[in-house]
Structures are given as C-alpha cells and as structure tokens.
C-alpha cells in the first residue's frame, strides 16, 4: 500500500465508518482509488465546514477565503505537477488515471460555494441541484473509477449521491439550523407552516422531513438499477452503502421526532447485516425486468 493510499485510508477510517465498511468489499485497485477520491472529497468538506474528521460542522471565520484556497488548490492539483498536500495529490492521481473532466471536481467546489453564499433553496429542484454538487457528482466520479463510461449508468450513480444527500439533509436538519443553514425546500416549509428550531422537529417540520425522505426513495430505487452495470464486487460494495445509508432514513421514520435527541446513525452490527442484504440486491439487479425508469427525476448536467 502506497503512502498516499495509507494516508487516505486513515482519514476515511476516522471520518466515515459507513464508507470504510463498504469499501472493504471492493477489489484492491479500485478500492485504493475510491478511498483516495473520497479522502479528497471529505477533506474539502471539512475545510469549508471547519470540521475535524467526523465531527459536527461549525460556523467558520472567513469562509470565502477557505473556498478560494480550496478552489486554487484543486486547480493546482488538476492542472499542474507541483507539490500539493496529500488530499490533493490523491485527487490528482485518481483524476488522471481515470480521465476525469476537470468540470467534475470543480462541480463539487461549486457546491461549497453555494454554502458560502448561503443560497436559498425554495423548491425541491433547488435542493437537488445543491445535492448534485455536494454528493451526486461524487457518485459520478466513483462510478468512473469503477470503469463506468456510459452516461445513463453515470446518471444512476448520480442518483445514489442525490439520495444520500437528501438523507443527510433529513438527518442533520437540527444541526444545520444551529449554524444558520437550512436545506429543506422553502416552499414545503411554507405549505406545512413549519419552522426549523428547537432540539427536536415539530410535528409540522417532521412532515416536511418525511416528504424529503419520500423523495430520496425515488433516487434510491433508480440507483439500484445501476448496480447491474458495475463489476460484481463494486456492485456489492455500493449496494451495501445504499442499504447502510438508507437505514438512517428508516430510523427517522421509526423513531419519529424523538429520534433527533441523539445522533442518528447505523450501528456496527446493523451494518454487518446490511452487507449481506446488499449481496442479494446485486443479484436482483441482474434479473430480467429489474429496471426502473428515470422519467421525471432530476438529471445532472452532462459535461463534454
């Protein structure tokens, strides 16, 4: 294992247990590149949010300067050959090995710019556009590392990122409100007469959260279709990640507003069980007639 892979693996183990668990199922070469890519994505997120690995976001001083530095470092990694820190060296290696369009990593940076600008999200499409920039494009890049070139399959990979981010938004609504952020569609909040305040969601706010989780289900269903086009071990890993993350939404549904009194996550024992179920999901995805149409779903921009 190279020093760069080792450094990236250590960062991911600390920062995302769910990803670290799912990544173990991948073939070694692909696993190394996905870990390096994820390490850069996680580092970029932490820079903007002022987070230590895996901690809650905090309000940060001079977010625009952080964004400008992140953008400059990313471009330096993609365009040059000079020395860069390990997360950016990891991005450089993976992007060149898998022929990423420069627009892909920069789309992620644009998502962080939306945070810095405190963008207002009035509609579900607004939220999905943001979700593409901070998560959907990560799914696209991961799929490319796994050998995917076809746009329809990359769209399914993007759908998984969208589903993950909608689940994130539902889980983190209270924490986000503490630092002045809200990613729930404003028109939904207005329709429900809901406000984002207090230690647990009000009944009105909880109905909006459930509505967002319903939207996530459409993208999880679409993403499952793409499993059939991945190498078997990659498909198993992604199916497991889907199950592990979707379980967060199921906990919110089961626990009601009171679920927010503690960190909502999936236990280690549950993750192990979901790894096995993910294998069955892969098998089902390869059966005739397993496809689900994407008609009506938000679609990512297709860069040349």
From Swiss-Prot:
Which molecular function terms from Gene Ontology are attached? 15-cis-phytoene synthase activity; geranylgeranyl diphosphate synthase activity; metal ion binding; squalene synthase [NAD(P)H] activity
Q: Does the keyword Transferase apply?
A: yes
Q: Which Pfam families does the record cross-reference, listed alphabetically?
A: SQS_PSY
The record's listing under CDD domains reads: Trans_IPPS_HH
- Enzyme class name: transferase
Reaction(s) the record says it catalyses:
2 (2E,6E,10E)-geranylgeranyl diphosphate = 15-cis-phytoene + 2 diphosphate
**Keywords per UniProt:** Carotenoid biosynthesis, Magnesium, Manganese, Metal-binding, Transferase
| Record InterPro entries | Isoprenoid_synthase_dom_sf (IPR008949), Squ/phyt_synthse (IPR002060), Squalene/phytoene_synthase_CS (IPR019845), Trans_IPPS_bact-type (IPR044843), Trans_IPPS_HH (IPR033904)
According to its UniProt entry, the protein's GO biological process terms are: carotenoid biosynthetic process
What does the record give as EC number? 2.5.1.32
Q: Which cofactor does it need?
A: ATP; Mn(2+); Mg(2+)
- Cite the cofactor comment: ATP is required for the transferase activity but it does not seem to be hydrolyzed during the reaction.
Q: In which pathway is this protein known to take part?
A: Carotenoid biosynthesis; astaxanthin biosynthesis; Carotenoid biosynthesis; phytoene biosynthesis
Q: What does this protein do?
A: Involved in the biosynthesis of carotenoids for the production of astaxanthin. Catalyzes the condensation of two molecules of geranylgeranyl diphosphate (GGPP) to give prephytoene diphosphate (PPPP) and the subsequent rearrangement of the cyclopropylcarbinyl intermediate to yield 15-cis phytoene.
Family to which the UniProt record says this protein belongs = Belongs to the phytoene/squalene synthase family.
Q: What is this protein called?
A: 15-cis-phytoene synthase
